[in-house]
Amino acid sequence: MPTPEQIEVAGSLARLAAIDLATAEKLAPDPEMDDRPVGFHAQQAVEKAVKVVLMLEGVDFPKTHDLEYLIVLAEKHSIAMEPELESASWLTPWAADFRYDDAPIETLDRKRAIAVANAAITWCHELLDEKQG
């Protein structure tokens, strides 16, 4: 069981994840918006949500943007997750690689990115509610 302090930190991170999701959702419909900020905020929402769950389950994790690493870490600790999240590692390059390079990039599947981020936010909030209750 996480301590009240851990729950507070997890709650703060969950709120930041929700802000990233809201930002991605706001930017995504605009066809003139470059994919980079949309992908970045979707990736950040997923990353923060996974970290919230790891934190609440007492799993230590390094400072990383690597979603595959974080997802495998959750799986190693038998943490069940939404099927959409099991393959969310495709969002990892949007955290830094594409954000700091103006070379041509792959096209972001915006609907998929938002759907994965939504699933991640729902997942972490459900666990947060359970741990708070």
Features from the language model and the residues they span:
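Terminal alpha-helical segments
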Residues: 1-133
